[in-house]
Amino acid sequence: MKDGKMTALAISSTALGFVLLATHATGVGVALDKVRAAAFGHAPQDQQQQVMLEQTFPVGAGGTLVIDVRDADVRVTTAAGGQSSVTVLAEARDQDWARQVFERMRFEVGVSGTTLTVRAHDPDIRSEEWREHRGVSMTVRVAIPNRFDVRITTADGDVEVGDIEGAVQLRTSDGDVQLGNVTGSASVTTSDGDVTAGDITGGVEFRTSDGDVHVGVVSGPAIVLQSSDGDIDAGTLAAEKITVRTQDGDIVLASVAGELDAAVGDGDVTVRFAKAAPASITAGDGDIAVSADGAFGFDLDLSGGDVSVPRGMVVQGTVSSRGARGTVNGGGPLIRVRSGDGSVVVNLPGAR
């Protein structure tokens, strides 16, 4: 048996060598495809996609979409119209195996009133089955009118939702989430993945345990952006209460209008205020930079490894290389900044 393994290895190595020698003649892309084929026994084009389910329903604007699938990617598109449709696609090398997996998932698709529901169960595939047949990728595609509420839950898969007017709730245990522009509230939770969204009106709660958070212009009564391990960057944030936290990553907030509570364990923080509002900004080990769009009045309480304010910025109080406390432009909401081992730079334009 050992000799057989060595012979197979020699054949694979020889095939791999011929593929690499062919690189100059056939191009890098073709050679890489052949390398994959030699290493794994199939080429990328062996993957085939087939439609497993396709249905259309008379559910127009103002409805609700509920999706609960165990192991599949979810893609939701929106457009003007009075109908909704559901398509389930399977991508695999073995089409018979793909059909078996689909049947094991026991998809349930139906309408009750104005609620369109898509549910699927865990296919319960054993490890030896995966080794024999290789993987199967399931995708649930749903098309709905622009004005719709959306609730999606998946245990393992990416989630994409286009522009929509309505409340959005997205949950995935393992996958990235992409969300378009939303007129309504948006709540997103993923245990392992990035969260990316456009402009949102209605409030936001985005949480990821391991991934970055990227948002555009967001407004509403409250905004929460949180990551345990990842960067957070946002365009304009406008709310009564804004909470931004990450344990390991940078925070960049281009424009803030509202009470801010920002904290990072290990990373830098950059904040620009669009109006005067209370703020607490903390970095365990990182630099903090604070600026403002105008000559707003603030109370300052700054502390860090190296604290600095620009020349000409008048602070009524005390300023040293380790901290500053006082008022700017007659005083106003308190900006409290703390960095355990990093620089703190505050630059308030017009505060001269």
List where the protein language model places each region.
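Intrinsically disordered, low-complexity terminal regions
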Residues: 1-352
